[in-house]
Amino acid sequence: MHKELYPVNSEVAKKAWIDEAKYKAMYERSIQDNEAFWAEQAERLDWIKKWDKVKEVSFKKPVSIKWYLGGKMNVSYNCVDRHLKTRGDKTALLWEADNPSTPSRKITYKELHLEVCRFANVLKKMGVKKGDVVTIYMPMIPDTAVAMLACARIGAVHSVVFAGFSPDSISDRILDGQCRFVITGDAGFRGSKVVALKENIDKALVKTPDVQKVLVVKYAGTTVDMKPGRDLWYHEEVKTVSDQCEPEPMDAEDPLFILYTSGSTGKPKGVMHTTGGYLVYASMTHQYVFDYHEDDIYWCSADVGWVTGHSYIVYGPLANGATSLFFEGVPNYPTPSRFWEVVDKHKVTIFYTSPTAIRSLMREGDAAVKTTSRKTLRLLGSVGEPINPEAWAWYHDVVGEGRCPVVDTWWQTETGGILITPLPGAIAQKPGSATLPFFGVQPKLLTNEGQEIHGPGEGVLVIADSWPGQMRTVYRNHERFEDTYFSNYPGYYFTGDGCRRDQDGYYWITGRVDDVINVSGHRLGTAEIESALVAHHKVAEAAVVGYPHDIKGQGIYAFVTLKSGETASEELRKELIQTVRKEIGPIATPDLIQWAPRLPKTRSGKIMRRILRKIAENHPDQLGDTTTLSEPAVVQELVDNRMNR
C-alpha cells in the first residue's frame, strides 16, 4: 500500500529554487500583482525590444489573448545564440538511438548554432519566408530540433506531425495549415521497426497539390522515391549554404508553431502558440517544476510530435541552457530495463515520462529496474494523463528508491506549459493528485450550470485568467476557438476536464468531460475514430467511448452497427481495425469492438454516450435513467453482449 501524503524532503527544499514559504509568497503575488509578476519573469529572456504592455486579455467574446505587446525577440536566439559565450562547449542535445548499439551523439551549443544556421539557410534557399507554415514529419533525431529552431530563426511557423500518424492525417494537417513546404526523413526507427516517413509523405501529398518543396533528411539509409523539382536531399543542399544566419526579429505575438490536437467534433484543431509568452512560460515552468540547475542532465522521454516534446525537450530546456536528452526508442526495447540503462549511461538527474510507460514497466516487475543503478536520479516527473496511485507509488519507491520527489504535472497542448503541479521543494505530494496551481494560474471548479464550487468538491475544471503560455487561437478558425474553450462557461477557459478538490485544496483530475479519449497520454477525438469506422462500406453507424485500461489509462471501445444484410465476423473486425489504423494511425486502434444491432438514442436521435460508457466500463448497474430513450430495450441487448467483463 502507498502512503496518502509524501512530505517535502528537507534536503530537497534546501537546494531548491522554491521552498514552501517562497511558493506561497510568489503565488500570492502572481495573482494580486499579476502584470508586474509576469514582467519580471519575462526578464529571463533576451528581448530585441522590450514590450509596451504586459497583457491585454478578454475571455469574453470577442476572445483575445495578447502578452508582451510590442515586444520583439527571436526564439532561436534565446535557445541557442545567447548561450554561446558562457555555455558554448556545453552539450545542448544528447541523442540516444532506438538501437542501443548505435553510438549516441552529443551536440554542443556551438555546434547546434552552426547546424541551425545552415538549416535555416537551406529553408530560405527553398523559398521559405517569414510567416510560412512548414510541416515537419521526422524521426526522433537531433535534426528535428534543428529544423524547428531553424523555422523559428527565420520566422517560419512549424507544424510538427507525430511520426506515427497516417498519410490521411498528414494531408489533413497540411491542407488546414495551407502549407507549401515539408521537412521529412527517409525513414525512422521505433522499437526495431522501420517507420517509412518519406513513403507516407508521398502518399499524403497526392491530396495536397499546393506543396512545392519537400526537404528530405537522409537518416535510415532506406531507398526512397525522389520527385524531381519537388524533393531535395538536405545533405546535398547544405553544402551550398553559409553557416551564419541572422535571427529574424519577431513580434511577441507572431506565431511560433501550430500543433494539431484532437477535438470532440472530429476535425483536428490547429492549436496556435506565439513567440514571447510561450517561451517565457516554457522556460519558467521548466526551471521551477523540475527544479532545474546548471549541472543537471535532463530527460523528457516524450516524442517531439506532441506538445510535451515542444515545451520540455526543445524550447524550455534550451532556453535555460540545459542538456536535453533526445531518445528515439521505446521503454521496452530491447528489454524493459532500457529507460534505466539510458539513465545510467548518461547520468540523467531529472526524468519526465508518461503514466502509460510507467504502468507498462511496472507490469514487467521490479527486477528489470533493480538491475540498474539509477543513483544519479534526483527528480521524477509524470505527464499526459492522471497517474493512478499504485503506479505513482511504484515510480516513487522502486524507480526513485524513495529519494526522488515525483512531479505529477497537469497541462494540455492548449496551455503551452504546466498549469497544476507540485514544486519539489515546496509542495507535499499525494499519489494521484496534480496538487496545486503554478504561479499566475487560477483554477476554479464549476457545476454543469456554471456555478462556482468553493472548498472541497467536484466539478468542471476552468481557469479564471490567462497565463503567457496559453494558445491564442485555432489556426484560421477563431470562431472554433471561442466555441470550444469559451462558450460553455463564459469568462473562463474551459479545460474539458473534470476535477475534484480535496480539503487541503489539492486538485485531482478525474478525466475528460467531452467526447475525447486519453489513450497513453494522447488525446483522440471519438468523432474522428467513428468517422473512420463508418467509412467502411459495411458499417451503418458507430459510437466510440473510452474505458479503463490497465496500461494505456483509457482503451478504445467501439459499438458498431452494420448495414442491413451484412454479417459480423472476425474477418470484418480485423478490416475495421485496419481502416482506423490507415485513416488515423496505430494510436487510434480500437481495443474492443462490440457488434450492436442498434444504438441507444434519445427521441431526438442523439446517441446516449453516457450509457455506452457505463456498458464499456462494465458498470451496467449504473446506467441511470433510460426512460428518455426511443427504444429502451436496446440497452439490455448491449449489456448482455458486452465485451469488457
From Swiss-Prot:
Keywords: Acetylation, ATP-binding, Ligase, Magnesium, Metal-binding, Nucleotide-binding. Its cofactor is Mg(2+). Gene3D superfamilies: 3.30.300.30, N-terminal domain of ligase-like. Signal peptide: none annotated. Mg(2+) binds at residues 534, 536, 539. GO terms for cellular component: cytosol. The modification N6-acetyllysine is found at residue 606. The keyword Acetylation applies. Belongs to the ATP-dependent AMP-binding enzyme family. Catalyzes the conversion of acetate into acetyl-CoA (AcCoA), an essential intermediate at the junction of anabolic and catabolic pathways. AcsA undergoes a two-step reaction. In the first half reaction, AcsA combines acetate with ATP to form acetyl-adenylate (AcAMP) intermediate. In the second half reaction, it can then transfer the acetyl group from AcAMP to the sulfhydryl group of CoA, forming the product AcCoA. This is Acetyl-coenzyme A synthetase. The gene is acsA.
